[in-house]
Amino acid sequence: MIESKQELYEYLEMDKKALGIKRKFPRPFIDEIWKYEILMLKLAYLINCKDNFMYKPITLITRLRYEKLGMKLGFSIGINSFGPGLNIAHYGTIVVNGNARIGSNCWIYPGANIGANTGGPKDVPNIGDNVYIGPGAKLFGNINIADNISIGANAVVTKSFTTSGITIAGVPAKIIKDNNPNGKLMMQRINNN
């Protein structure tokens, strides 16, 4: 959760590194995912830090731009859900409940759905740092996912996995490897930028 302008700048820089971008500004009509992440972080900053009458018009305009670009790209991601270092790999449907909490350095692919179970809006996943969420993965309910986990394509995760550094996949999800091959790739991308 962004609580200062300094944190906003740190989040922006880490997201840029996670996306593998070295440019200073997004290119028009090309860097749409990066623009979406920038708007998401700016909106979180405005909501968390500038919640007064003077900033309401700026917050409203930023929210409208964020929602419009999200519809164009197919993203429905709640504000304050992700930590720094988010990498949205491609355009496509991605749905993340606004109450879900995902740690830093998350890679998420199209078709992913992180949502509430029938228990209510607070019955949502809590996901650790350095997690890879593969295409079409579904995570539901009050579950905890440890750090350094890869979630395979089309996995349906309905129970907690508290062992760090594993790969899970399947319907329902189960451990298929005792290591996380995507973790090294994620760290190389972040450290090389």
Q: Where are these predicted regions, by residue range?
A:
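Terminal amphipathic alpha-helical/low-complexity segments used for targeting or macromolecular assembly
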Residues: 1-73, 181-193
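Short N-terminal helix-initiation segments at or just after the protein's N-terminus
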Residues: 26-31, 73-79, 112-120
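Extended, non-globular alpha-helical segments
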Residues: 58-60, 74, 105-107, 118
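Left-handed beta-helix
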Residues: 79, 84-85, 89-98, 103-104, ...
